């Protein structure tokens, strides 16, 4: 949206490109030299990164992937301590076992969001996390099992409310100290 606002605020005169065409073309622009706040990987939708095996305590080539993504991997679960991280970046953490309940989850901006799903020791599964600017989804073996979408939260004795948006720019920079076997990591830009 920033590109659209910039055009309107700079001049807004003699706009000859229809909005739909402009909106499509603006996504091809970079944010600024050396900046990637949107977490873009690759130029087009499709598979943008893959790794046969993910090992603990490693640095990966990308910091994160931004909205409209799918990250999938195969897992053979092990007994993970609460707080076990799978991936992290400076902005977020994705947990194999969150620090409170031991479920799959993620933390960002000081908030912990958990899925109602735990990887059990010995369990074989294909896990997928997909996200956009409104919702983060958990896929298990190709099926969506939970969606963390916008919640209305009330405060001031219920008189006021705000929307809590449970989204995630998926962290990829570093792997955690986990025991489970993680293979077939695939990152898609959708």
Describe each region flagged by the PLM:
Residues 146-184:
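Flexible glycan-contacting loops in extracellular carbohydrate-active proteins
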Residues 109, 139-146:
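Short strand-turn-strand beta-turns centered on an Asx-Gly dipeptide
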Residues 76-80, 134, 177:
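Short solvent-exposed strand-capping/beta-turn motif centered on an Asx-Ser/Thr pair
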Residues 71-73, 123-140:
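Short tryptophan-centered beta-strand motifs in secreted/extracellular beta-sheet-rich domains
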Residues 105-126:
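Short, aromatic/His-centered strand-loop micro-motif at the edge of beta-sheets
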Residues 46-105:
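Extracellular glycan-recognition modules
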Residues 58-63, 113-119, 157, 171-173:
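Beta-strand-rich interaction surfaces with strong enrichment in secreted/lumenal proteins
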Residues 1-56:
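Flexible, acidic glycine-rich loops studded with aromatic residues
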């Amino acid at each position: 949206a920033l590109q659209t606002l910039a055009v309107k605020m700079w001049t807004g005169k003699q706009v000859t490109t229809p909005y739909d065409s402009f909106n499509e073309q603006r996504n091809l622009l970079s944010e600024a030299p050396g900046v990637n706040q949107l977490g873009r990987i690759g130029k087009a939708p499709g598979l943008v990164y893959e790794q046969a095996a993910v090992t603990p305590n490693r640095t990966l080539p990308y910091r994160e992937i931004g909205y409209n993504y799918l990250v999938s991997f195969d897992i053979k679960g092990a007994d993970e301590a609460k707080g076990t991280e799978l991936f992290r970046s400076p902005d977020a953490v994705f947990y194999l076992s969150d620090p409170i309940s031991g479920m799959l989850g993620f933390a960002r901006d000081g908030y912990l969001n958990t899925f109602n799903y735990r990887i059990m020791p010995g369990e074989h599964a294909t896990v997928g996390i997909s996200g956009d600017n409104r919702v983060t989804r958990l896929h298990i073996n190709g099926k969506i099992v939970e969606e963390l979408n916008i919640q209305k939260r009330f405060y001031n004795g219920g008189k006021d409310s705000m929307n809590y948006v449970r989204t995630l720019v998926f962290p990829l920079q570093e792997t955690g100290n986990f025991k489970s076997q993680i293979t077939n990591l695939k990152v898609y830009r959708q």
